[in-house]
Amino acid sequence: MKLFVWRRVGLGALTIVLTTFLVHLALYAAPGDPIGYLLNGQPATPERVAALREQFHLDDPFFVRYFSWVSDLLTGDLGISSSFNSEVSMLLATRIPTTLQLVLISIVFIFGFGLSMGIFAGLKSGGFDSFSMTIVTILSSIPAFVGSYLLINFFAVQLGWFPAIGSGDGSVLSTLWHMTLPAIALALSAGSYVARTTRASVKVESSSEHVVTATVRGIPRGKILSRHIIRNALLPIMSLGGLLLVGLMVATAFVEQAFAINGLGSLLVVAARQQDFALVQAITLIMVVSFVVVNLVVDILSWILDPRMRSDGA
């Protein structure tokens, strides 16, 4: 167990280190003086140029600049946003909770819909299976931004059941009310993917040798479903954790823009448009670290729950 965990932690740490290097290198990949890119049309006053050179350590050799930047990251100094003229850490502190709320609510929809639809479709054959997979296929083909505008037009504008913009006043009920449509828009594609994967896993487990043997021995159907079919079918779903997170983080940019939510995704869009390099750097690193942490947790849980991984010495 310890060797497995340390191996995964080491790979995750290596991924983060390589990402920091590539993100830092991106500033110097473009031709010309980085100052011209960082100014982004702002007046090139001596004070502004000097501040940028100090912030990005431009007067130091490349590796000195890199390690100075990493040192700043570790102390919480993420630089100054040129778009908002504010500390990047302060901007992130106000935006991250909103995006976390959106992602967590969408995860409830993703697994609530995906697992239930996939399990029932996997256990049933014929009409329900075909109908449910048709619905899943249609939903999976709807991009997040298209789904956002469809939901806004029907449920917010036509019916008036939900607000069209914003994230609420901070209370639990207001947050849930405002976040329901964005979370559904975010969950459409991912929930459909979970449903298809769950259905396939359930069908494979239902026809496996140990399930057939348990059925012949007269073990109650409920025990077979809970202990063998569903439990084993959920293991492949866990391995999707990292990929689902990446998809959700990317989709939040479109969904938050559509619903005018002040979250991390909409902040990334603004930063990219304004060529706010310090802000883009910070958000990119947050996404990579989140991906690494989620994958690490998923790998450990899979190792604990799946005897096959332990027997293989993974």
Predicted region positions:
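Alpha-helical transmembrane segments of integral membrane proteins
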Residues: 2-3, 13-19, 90-129, 144, ...
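Hydrophobic aliphatic residues
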Residues: 26, 30, 38, 42, ...
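Hydrophobic alpha-helical transmembrane segments of membrane transport/permease proteins
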Residues: 15-64, 159-178
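Phosphate-coordinating loops and pocket residues in cytosolic domains that bind phosphorylated ligands
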Residues: 7, 40, 64, 133, ...
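Membrane-water interface segments at the C-terminal ends of transmembrane alpha-helices
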Residues: 22-29, 57, 71, 134-163, ...
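Alpha-helical transmembrane segments and their helix-start/interface "positive-inside/aromatic belt" motifs
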Residues: 8-14, 134-136
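An internal, D/E-rich "acidic patch" concept
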Residues: 59-115
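Short hydrophobic helices that act as membrane-entry/anchoring signals
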Residues: 3, 7, 64-68, 72, ...
